[in-house]
UniProtKB/Swiss-Prot annotation:
This is Uncharacterized protein C895.08c. Residues 391-406 have a biased composition (Polar residues). Keywords: Cytoplasm, Nucleus. It is found in: Cytoplasm; Nucleus. The keyword 4Fe-4S does not apply. Signal peptide: none annotated. Residues 370-406 are annotated as: Disordered. Transmembrane segments: none annotated.
Amino acid sequence: MDNSRDKIHILGAVSDTFQEVQHPCSILKYKVYFVTTDTFYCKYLTASFTGLKKFPTERQLPLECHFNHIDWDLGNNFKVKEGVFYTFDIIAPLPRCTPRTIVTQEGSISYKLTVKLYTEDDCRMPKSANVPVVVPFTLNPDRIPESQHIRYGAPLNDACFTSLSMKSSKYSFLTAFFKYPQQCYKGPGCVCPLLIDLESEDADVLSSTPGSAGTDDPHIDPIAINSQDSQFIFQDRLPRLSNDCDMKGRSSLSRTSSPVVEKKLKRYYIRVLLVQSITFFLFNDAFRNSITVLFEDGKWSPPIVPGLHSRVEFTIPVNDLIHGSCTENPHLLVRHSIYVSIHSREPSSLSRKLAPPFLRTHKAKSNSLFSMKRPSSSSSSLSGSWHGDTENSVKQSLASPSEASLPNLSKYSRKNAKKLNEWLDSLDFKLPIYLFHRKLESELSHLPPYSPYRDSYFYLEDDDGDADTPSTASLDYFSNISPPDFLNKA
């Protein structure tokens, strides 16, 4: 977090919520903070959220229209002291008529959040600051036909992409530049593009020993540098060779050219994983966490040339069976992250390392430490077995109490979960990502039923517990959950 002084910092995003299961709602959640080097008297501090529609016209300037004004009074008549950390929360539900952020040739819809500070004293603090706000989904079901089936997310334009730069802990001379949409829509055919650029700050990116050219894959041939020099050596040596000293000339040629030919540009293997973390908040301030690897892929980077970027592109599928990001449910927290690691050689697949034995024969990219027993077919990952192939099959499976009962889940190994946690923490980079679903009211149906007496995800961690005790909670339990206090205040 940036704690630089004499600057108004604004952090946050638009998140979905389960305030009411039957009615979709999204929350604007931002935090304003600042630290000053002066002491002054602030008359008032305000914040405003404004939407802007732009339509092209025959004139040079487009037609602009402001809408969806939300105002906050953050403070009045208070003294700002030097070196004190001031923070203010900006929280409010968006109106149902809020359209999504979109940029097209026929017009655009954008939003911004503005914070204004008014004082009559001399100070270094700016009087205003604003940030763009991306609304990734539409909340107007009356305007869109059949909106109960699908709500399109944010378009993948440059304004929706987040750019990050990080240094590798394993290779200190490498800097990785990431570009990806931090807010992404999930559904049939939806993907999350991830662009990774590697840049070497060390001039010594070459290898002069065989087998250490940045890759041990025999199918990948590193590119030799100084090819013109080696060709010149060949042309310069060959006329001087004679039949009498043919062998001597060949050995001399080999000794002379080998140091040049063996210097190769390094390549690195980049592995990407999409990981889902589900946390159940239990009673007595206890919680339990589940981590599932949803996607795994890896590619070799192009040869890294000093001073240039070596780009690797990944396309991560985000299907509708993946849970949407959830941060407002009082008993449930769903988060997603993209883990990236850099290797000098191709590592073995995660499914063969950490997955249970019955999953190691599967070649699917999605692996989970949870699985469901089926009498007609072998066990598979949680994403493929619990959710089913389509949303209709999910509803049919949950409609049957016998299929949705807790004993259908197979034994969960705490040892595997601990190994997976430790292994993910050892990776080089962790990128946060927020996934939004089509229907907020159906998201909870993707999860097993929650019970205050039996945690459907984590009861299997208790080896001494009675695994045959079914859960008495129904999916309607979530509809009676009261919203958080800050939503009532808003």
